[in-house]
């Protein structure tokens, strides 16, 4: 099936032939729907904290930072912002020249409220010889939009979200990336003022990100009294996946198999390369101005404290199990911990001998840990928290997307629709074992949880394979705890007009 040239291409990308063959099998067989026991809710998989607990975990996190542990905040930031401007691209190509839709009218009626307004005004003066106000008054709306989106102006239609100006301040306006620098200083700084932030970016924008850091870093260090260690990585070519045609044969372009990026699940490799004890993960577009940051900072510290508490308890159990110094009562206590704290159950454990039970417990406890914030549903999109079945017969907490659930099954559909919370992508992860050794994170991926989607390339249809999502199947075999966090901590920017919401003004 593969030519010598194909094999050279695989080697160049660092992809094993066996991996490509596995992907082709996945296209033919598809991915199974995932079985749900129930949606997670407060009291059934989601922890809701009272004021006393909240203060306890806040103090725990502050104490952890004082001990100078290595904490890194990682921000996936490679996606282009083009979808943010979908409606404005449509306006540019429309057969009318003045705003018609509600979206278009809102954009132009409030244009001076965008953080990029003064930059856009400069671009219009330079390229059109007229200000935004003059262009709008003369009905030349499309010139304003083309200066926003195209390379002759701000080029926002091709830049990633991290480089776009999101928020206005009295002295300067901030990009999404700068808001993450601020956040890092507020909840992830060690006692001696070290802040580690890692951005995953696309190769074409790496230089732009580095230039912005070089320009702004010292200002933020002075403002917050910290020292930033800012690093970048790109998705590895070895995580690209092969595309196929309608017959599930490799899709070829000029005779060469076409590979596509494997989606955010590929970032488990980047996460695996990070030298840290604890890693925060948060999307690039979920940021707010300083006046609204308090709930975000507070709950980041709280979920950090929950993680530290869990890890301490789990490490104590792992040490006992590895040493062999435990009683039957200790094993019962660990089973209760699995049931009540981690919502991991397996009916077969009641039939196990003590030695087998100890091995089972070690397998379930000695793995990476994540604590995930969950927000009450209010119509916002996002995957959901579930208690789900795993391949080994256990049930545990998982984050699944709607496409992974069989909506033709009435029970599964009801479980999905009865969900009270959604996943805002608000994670904190412990990635070392009780001896401080790093876990090898790709070992904990469930390969049966990928996605297949239909795409096109130069007018030809193809099927693309996405790897198990970073917070979905890529962390399927992690110890997981869900904590309820307030809706104020979730303020994503999906369209340019979202920047006009009060949360971004």
Placement of each model-derived feature along the sequence:
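Intrinsically disordered, low-structural-confidence terminal and linker regions
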Residues: 1-25
